[in-house]
């Protein structure tokens, strides 16, 4: 899934109004942060590092939440709850829209990539920055259902954004 779609997912989670408005940036960042591994990945296929495994986020967020609990700091606990929800949403949407690499749901117990639709790993043997140009971009949009899903997420987020402002009296 492209970054804009992950950001849209974070925005949609924020719009559920689970926590106060001050947490908006954390919702957005948490839905995107697993993709930071693209900065050190040499190819699209290698882009799903430990940051794309649920065990990493379960351990990190549990430890963070527990520290917040011990210190009796609600903000710390809230931060790690949002981080967990956002990163899990990221992994789930990557699982749904996988084209070249799936999600290792059971890592480190096994190294199997799980995906909803068939993937073509060899199409991901390109530098991560070449995702935005053909031929990868053309390949990415071949699956019309997955493309429609991403476009739908973005449209819903934009509609909610532009129509959620209160109108002056």
Predicted regions and their residues:
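N-terminal membrane-targeting hydrophobic helices
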Residues: 1-169
């Amino acid at each position: 899934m492209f970054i804009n779609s992950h950001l849209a997912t974070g925005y949609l989670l924020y719009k559920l109004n689970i926590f106060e408005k001050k947490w908006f940036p954390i919702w957005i960042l948490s839905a995107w942060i697993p993709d930071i591994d693209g900065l050190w990945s040499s190819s699209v296929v290698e882009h799903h590092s430990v940051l794309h495994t649920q065990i990493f986020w379960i351990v990190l967020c549990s430890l963070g939440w527990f520290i917040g609990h011990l210190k009796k700091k609600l903000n710390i606990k809230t931060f790690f709850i949002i981080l967990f929800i956002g990163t899990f949403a990221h992994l789930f949407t990557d699982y749904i829209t996988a084209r070249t690499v799936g999600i290792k749901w059971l890592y480190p117990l096994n190294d199997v990539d799980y995906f909803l639709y068939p993937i073509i790993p060899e199409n991901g043997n390109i530098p991560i920055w070449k995702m935005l140009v053909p031929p990868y971009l053309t390949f990415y949009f071949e699956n019309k259902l997955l493309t429609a899903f991403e476009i739908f997420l973005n449209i819903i987020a934009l509609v909610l954004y532009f129509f959620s402002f209160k109108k002056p009296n």
